[in-house]
Amino acid sequence: LQGIWNHSPYAPWDSKYTININAEMNYWPAEVTNLSETHEPLFDMVTDLAVTGSETAKVLYDAKGWVAHHNTDIWRACGPVDAAYFGMWPNGGAWLAQHLWQHYLFTGDKEF
């Protein structure tokens, strides 16, 4: 929940990026406020997650593509963590992809 803003070596929630809504909420204003460039760190994270998440998809689900569960970290871990009732949520990649789509809708950048 804290990402890079944590000051403690033993952070609450391990200072993970919670991608089942918390991280996304930080970027909701990016396009509607005409600050598209502020989306770039999130897009970099999505690019990284596509790499680590492809291994996770293959190992856990014998699937092509990539998957991210509800949390990730600086190493872009994608597997389920913490309690099963919320950790087994393989929709993080889909939620993050909404930001890619919103960026395209607002900018019309076909090369993106």
Regions found by a protein language model. Give the residues of each.
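Substrate-binding groove/exosite segments of carbohydrate-active enzymes
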Residues: 1-112
